[in-house]
């Protein structure tokens, strides 16, 4: 089964030894705890930005070199990869107890959630693929312009 995150993605965020301690002493890339934490993180991100952005495209797993004409192209948004790992690791640490979560891990989790809130609300622009309306072929937007002022007619 192809997954969005690769084993090599974790190397920039956490040492392999610590990740093995969190997931058990088995092959940690196939570990059920890790898979569940990744799925939870992806669901959390989808819930925050899914109304504006095409999450099916964002979370598309990498194609293997055999499926991609012999080339390994990483088309994933690296910021999304980073915050997915941050949220995944926070969930893995959380199962050990709230006092055992390192401060930097809690801060990175909170930063990721704050960014997702801002992007989901439209306060922070990003270059993720927007949802396209099949009828108009334009990006779906829920932007509405209104005013609390009553309309004025100044014609005399």
Language-model features: locations:
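Short loop/turn elements at secondary-structure junctions
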Residues: 90-156
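Conserved short "hinge" loops at termini or chain/domain junctions
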Residues: 1-77, 138-156
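Generic beta-strand or strand-like secondary-structure segments
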Residues: 40, 44, 83, 87-91, ...
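Ordered, amphipathic secondary-structure segments that act as subunit-interaction surfaces
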Residues: 51, 73-94
